From Swiss-Prot:
This is Elongation factor G. The gene is fusA. The lineage of its organism: Bacteria, Pseudomonadati, Pseudomonadota, Betaproteobacteria, Nitrosomonadales. Residues 8-290 form the tr-type G domain. It comes from Nitrosomonas eutropha (strain DSM 101675 / C91 / Nm57). The keyword Hydrolase does not apply. SMART domains: EFG_C, EFG_IV.
């Protein structure tokens, strides 16, 4: 099959950043300059192409990652045509999961920084996620025209807070309302974009005299960075004291792809300056599917396997997102790592053990779609007609099975009870919630056994608000929502050895299960760990999985207030059995009895979710804000100055943060903003724990 673009001319990139850094506007400009979109979509008009759900247009924030394909030949039309698949990811912390799934399937990313706000909490989160997946990235310092814009301050924050190695390949010409263009340090030219053509035309001039010395200094640093890529480049540099443009690009590209440096660019997407040069940098420095390591997985025998990027290899893809489209139904977004697939082909989903037929294949441009017949290695596309697929599943050739690594999804930290307003809504609500849970793995639905209520859980208040809103808009279900509840956890603080016995022997076939367990605290965040220490067959092999199952089932219900138990290590080290009466169920029950007993004796404690809270407030309100955070059991961890504002970093229990935005608005005349994200679980103080336990 001949492709319009060879694989080395593919770029799968994400645009990621903190909320309000200008990420969606940047993505919009990419679509405009690559010729896909003929009218610029502005976020504050509610018309941005990438933000396609109604809630996104109303709130002016991006919730779901829209995937778009576009083509670019360079700002001056001097590159062969490249195909860029862009994924716009949300910056609001409640939707971190969307960022996580996008990064899993991307080869590179552009991180957008606000020139005034710099490195903000969500920037740190997405940066950590990108580190986890080893995604090479560029830094685009946006909003250079804003009051307080400071390119070099963002560079310093990237070093101090992100531990990154930023290498400026551009410098701004002027700043704030004097921002006029950029200095391209690779070519040593000043670049100015034409306002009348909305930035589609540009001209190169000599660098302004006042900035020539500065440009020479930073160019020297950039060339040193490029030369470190290889011995050959270093020798060229040492001999000539300079490097040719192609050598600079080659060196910077190699080091970017190895995650050793982050090329830094600048501009203002809103004023149509700099995004065009950023697109050129995507071609120059970010990897193609050929530059990234082969994707790893396991074959049907559980042995390690991998697939390199080749159309001749068997088909393997990862489903990274599910969305419901009002016209075509459920769309499964997937990234192809090897091989090709046509509409009508049958694929195998090893996670579910199911074969499915692909109906139609669509290439997405935000919420417009183009039907295609075939997709190949490196492509990101959407399929219609796959019923059983959930996020993170593998799709592969039925004759060459591979299961790609699944994604890790965070546990929800907040839950609310929802009740349908009418009997008619009852059934529809179940369908709606299950569909939404299938789309979003960080959203969970369960029924409370005691009250019979439907409980929905998610990553924050906004996350659940949007779920309820979507239920109403997309499924026509009206629901009453209870007050948000914190997802507490239980853990133990000391080691105990405990016996569990389940015996029923009254004539006929009886029940006999007997175990000795050692329970001890596990490292924070490690979860539940089961260790089999049985020697000499005290508990027969075939019953050991039943013991583990009995323990896992018991974890969901702690002894203090019925919250799930975390971070516990349990070893099965002894027990006994009966030739006739022992069975799996008896050992499951014995394990469960021992667990309940052991929990009571192992100094159980209540854990509460702690949030990293960052408040940006005008300096005059700092005292009020700090006092209020302290009254919420907050621990102030640091402060920073930005012109006219103070940034306060703190850690506060989630339970104390409900309704905080309203309080903060009134305490600062609406001028402060804050962001909050889950940090870790921590032991609740005695008085707090007692109050929670007494309510249960």
């Amino acid at each position: 099959m001949s492709k319009r673009n060879p694989l080395e001319r593919y770029r799968n990139i994400g645009i990621m950043a903190h909320i309000d850094a200008g990420k969606t506007t940047t993505s919009e400009r990419i679509l405009f300059y690559t010729g896909v979109s003929h009218k610029l979509g502005e976020v504050h008009d509610g018309a941005a192409t990438m933000d396609w759900m109604e809630q996104e247009q109303e709130r002016g924030i991006t919730i779901t990652s829209a995937a778009t394909t576009c083509f670019w030949k360079g700002m001056a039309g001097n590159y062969p045509e490249h195909r860029i698949n862009v994924i716009d990811t949300p910056g609001h912390v409640d939707f971190t999961i969307e960022v996580e799934r996008s990064l899993r399937v991307l080869d590179g990313a552009c991180t957008v920084f606000c020139s005034v706000g710099g490195v903000q909490p969500q920037t740190e989160t997405v940066w950590r996620q990108a580190n986890k997946y080893g995604v090479p990235r560029l830094a685009f310092v946006n909003k250079m025209d804003r009051s307080g814009a400071n390119f070099m301050r963002v560079r310093e924050q990237m070093i101090s807070r992100l531990k990154a190695n930023p290498v400026p390949i551009q410098l701004p010409i002027g700043a704030e309302d004097k921002f006029a263009g950029i200095i391209d340090l690779v070519k040593m030219k000043a670049v100015y974009w034409d306002d009348a053509s909305q930035g589609t035309k540009f001209e190169e001039r000599e660098i302004p005299a006042s900035q020539q010395a500065d440009a020479a200094t930073w160019r020297e640093k950039m060339i040193e960075s490029a030369a470190e890529a290889s011995e050959e480049l270093m020798n060229k540099y040492l001999e000539a004291g300079d490097l040719a443009v192609e050598d600079i690009k080659q060196g910077l590209r190699a080091r970017t792809i190895n995650n050793e440096i982050v090329p830094m660019l600048c501009g203002t997407a809103f004023k149509n300056k700099g995004v065009q040069a950023m697109l050129d940098a995507v071609l120059d420095y970010l990897p193609s599917p050929l530059d990234v390591p082969a994707i790893k997985g396991v074959d049907e025998n559980g042995l390690e396997d991998e697939r390199g990027p080749s159309e001749d290899s068997p088909f393997a893809a990862l489903a990274f997102k599910i969305a419901t489209d009002p016209y075509v139904g459920q769309l499964i977004f997937f990234r192809v790592y090897s091989g090709t697939v046509k509409s009508g082909d049958t694929v195998f989903n090893p996670v579910k053990g199911k074969r499915e037929r692909i109906g139609r294949l669509l290439q997405m441009h935000a919420n417009q779609r183009e039907e295609i017949k075939e997709v190949g290695t490196g492509d990101i596309a959407a399929a219609v007609g796959l019923k059983e697929v959930t996020t993170g599943d593998t799709l592969c050739d039925p004759n060459h099975v591979i299961t790609l690594e699944r994604m890790d999804f965070p546990e929800p930290v907040i839950h609310v009870a929802v009740e349908p307003k009418t009997k008619i809504d009852q059934e529809k609500m179940g369908i709606a919630l299950n569909r939404l849970a299938q789309e979003d793995p960080s959203f969970r639905v369960r029924t409370d056994e005691e009250s019979g209520q439907t409980i929905i859980s998610g990553m924050g208040e906004l996350h659940l608000e949007i779920i309820v809103d979507r239920m109403k808009r997309e499924f026509g279900v009206e629901a009453n929502v209870g007050a948000p509840q914190v997802a507490y956890r239980e853990a133990i603080r000391k080691q105990v050895e405990i016996e569990g016995k389940f015996v029923k022997q009254s004539g006929g076939r009886g029940q006999y299960g007997h175990v000795w367990l050692r329970m001890e605290p596990n490292e924070a965040g490690k979860g539940f760990e089961f260790v089999d220490e049985i020697k000499g067959g005290a508990v027969p092999r075939e019953y050991i999985p039943a013991v583990e199952k009995g323990l896992r089932d018991s974890l969901s219900n702690g002894v203090l207030a019925g919250y799930p138990v975390v971070d516990v290590k349990i070893a099965l080290f002894d027990g006994s059995y009966h030739d006739v009466d022992s069975n799996e169920n008896a050992f499951k029950m014995a394990a469960s009895i021992a667990f309940k007993d052991g929990m009571k004796k192992a100094s159980p404690v209540l854990l509460e979710p702690m949030m990293a809270v960052e408040v940006e407030t005008p300096s005059e309100f700092m005292g009020n804000v700090v006092g209020d955070l302290s009254s919420r059991r907050g621990i102030i961890q640091g402060m920073e100055d930005i012109p006219g504002f103070k940034v306060i970093r703190s850690e506060v229990p989630l339970a104390e943060m409900f309704g905080y935005s309203t309080i903060l608005r009134s305490a600062t005349q609406g001028r402060a903003t804050y962001s909050m994200e889950f940090k870790h679980y921590s032991e609740a103080p005695k008085n707090v724990a007692e109050a929670i336990i007494s309510k249960k």
